[in-house]
Amino acid sequence: EEGGRPPPPI
């Protein structure tokens, strides 16, 4: 489920 934490920086 998305919308919890933002994706990690790459």
Swiss-Prot record:
One of its GO terms (molecular function) is peptidase inhibitor activity. The keyword Plastid does not apply. One of its GO terms (biological process) is regulation of blood pressure. Disulfide bonds: none annotated. Its main location: secreted. It is found in: Secreted. One of its GO terms (cellular component) is extracellular region. Expressed by the venom gland. Belongs to the bradykinin-potentiating peptide family. This is Bradykinin-potentiating peptide 2. It comes from Bothrops neuwiedi. The lineage of its organism: Eukaryota, Metazoa, Chordata, Craniata, Vertebrata.
